[in-house]
């Protein structure tokens, strides 16, 4: 998903039409090998546009390691996903049998898409990972914790509206 978003952004800044063709998979790819064309000095603006179209693009994808979906965190990947993460991390503690957890799950999914590239969203099943839950004092579910620089900054207990979580996220993505 992140790569597709990145490629869509790249396609928007393509120099000229015809250099890229839409593939059946929905992604964009060069229609011919990109080689540097020799610069042609010409009084005609049309020829200079053609030369610019043949130049290799200076495309730099800044979407590296960006995920627009909720990632399942467990005891094996907890440190890498949450503690060592440079961006803020929203973690939902949940259980499959919990009704309010099922109500807030779509909200967390939306937040992952709305804040793609700004935060990482993870979820921890408290039945599968009781040690993580007890480390952070999770006694009720759903509980949402906000981490920044590996430290727990804020917590929200219960199925809360999306606006409540957005307010918390906005506090930590700007600072």
Swiss-Prot record:
GO terms for cellular component: chloroplast; cytoplasm. Residues 63-174 form the Thioredoxin domain. The keyword Aminoacyl-tRNA synthetase does not apply. Keywords: Chloroplast, Disulfide bond, Electron transport, Plastid, Redox-active center, Transit peptide, Transport. Gene3D superfamilies: Glutaredoxin. Disulfide bonds join 98-101. GO terms for molecular function: protein-disulfide reductase activity. InterPro entries: Thioredoxin, Thioredoxin-like_sf, Thioredoxin_CS, Thioredoxin_domain. Pfam families: Thioredoxin. It is found in: Plastid, Chloroplast. Residues 1-62 form a transit peptide. Forms a complex with heterodimeric ferredoxin-thioredoxin reductase (FTR) and ferredoxin. Participates in various redox reactions through the reversible oxidation of the active center dithiol to a disulfide. The M form is known to activate NADP-malate dehydrogenase. Belongs to the thioredoxin family. Plant M-type subfamily. This is Thioredoxin M-type, chloroplastic. It comes from Triticum aestivum (Wheat).
